[in-house]
């Protein structure tokens, strides 16, 4: 027979797993085709020349080369490109 009163419930006790987002390869570093450059939610960075975008907005290298980050356009969007080495 239990000699402890029933405890109240709580609305806490949950936490989501880390998503490991962010820049994986920085400007000036070498990449080969298929390397992930940026993992992101939404288009914080846009795909430039030599860079593709996955359906979860992940940017990846389409060609071998060197990563370059720059801002362009009226809205100062940040672009990631891969230049041939």
UniProtKB/Swiss-Prot annotation:
The domain of life for this entry's organism is Bacteria
- Example GO biological process: translation
User: Which Pfam families does the UniProt entry name for this protein?
Assistant: Ribosomal_L27 (PF01016)
Recorded GO molecular functions are: structural constituent of ribosome
Tell me the segments the record calls region Disordered: 1-20
Per the record, GO CC terms? cytosolic large ribosomal subunit
Which family does the similarity line name?
Belongs to the bacterial ribosomal protein bL27 family.
Q: State the name under which the record lists this protein.
A: Large ribosomal subunit protein bL27
* Organism encoding this protein: Psychrobacter sp. (strain PRwf-1)
Q: Which gene encodes it?
A: rpmA
């Amino acid at each position: 027979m239990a000699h402890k009163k029933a405890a109240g419930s709580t609305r806490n006790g949950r936490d989501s797993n880390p998503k490991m987002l962010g820049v994986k390869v920085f400007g000036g570093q070498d990449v080969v085709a298929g390397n992930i450059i940026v993992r992101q939610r939404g288009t914080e960075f846009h795909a430039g020349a030599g860079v593709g975008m996955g359906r979860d907005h992940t940017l990846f290298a389409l060609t071998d080369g060197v990563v370059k980050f720059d801002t362009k356009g009226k809205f100062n969007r940040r672009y990631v490109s891969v230049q041939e080495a």
